[in-house]
Amino acid sequence: MYEIINRFLIYKRSLVKISLFFYILSVLLFINGIVLTVRGNVTVGLYIVFGLSICCFIWAKFHIQLWQLTSSGILLWLRRLVILGIAVYLIFMGLILSCSYTDVDYTEDAVIVLGAGVTNGKVSKTLQNRLDACIDYYHKNSDIYIAVSGGLTRFKDGTEAEAMAKYLTDNGIPEDVIIIEDKSQSTLENYRFTKQIFEDKKICHDSIVFVTNDFHIYRAKKYATYCGFENAHALSTRTDLFTFVPALIREVLGVIDMWVFKLK
């Protein structure tokens, strides 16, 4: 009898811990979403964060009932499919994070700074971090060209490339080393259009550096190789915590899209 009671208490404590974990996760995700909303960072990743917050709250509140409800028939297969999806998502997250490092050697021929958002003609904090990393790189290897790549913004208030070029010149980078690519609307186009400019201007690009955020390195390197930049090195920049969560969630979708639709 004592053994049965003891097992029951252990079971109840486990349920309480599970509920508490998902309640806390729900609150943290909700706070993350509110902060990004206040900042004006409205993206697909933000909507996913709010959706996950709601799902975590529902699971914390009703996980026993939901588990029992999905214990047989089609709902059981649906539960297994959801678990499989979560596992695949976590594997992709691990893959992305495992590649989020810098591997430059400061002997490359050119730098490509990938666009990351502009508002009212000013670079976003994320893009500023990339440009600052590029400036630091230039001070260590000034015998290069810097391509800033990014087309019209969501609000049609100029191109990312123009804002990036202005930021670089305002911070001491000579105008004659800056190459502007202002037509692209995706990472794949960043590379394709920049490579065409390099070839038209006969700029050496045997070895290049691409500058982007840590969460974006894996996909950016795959696209670079796909577009013919065989010797592409990553210059990784940090992402602040509130931006990182939705960005990583969204990046998984980007990687899946890349493998399924883009790299053919």
What is each of the regions a protein language model found here?
Residues 31-38, 58-62, 91-98, 135, ...:
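Structural signature of transmembrane alpha-helix termini at the membrane-water interface
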Residues 84, 91-250:
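A structural signal for short, hydrophobic/glycine-enriched beta-strand patches
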Residues 244-264:
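A transmembrane-helix-recognition feature enriched in membrane-embedded lipid enzymes
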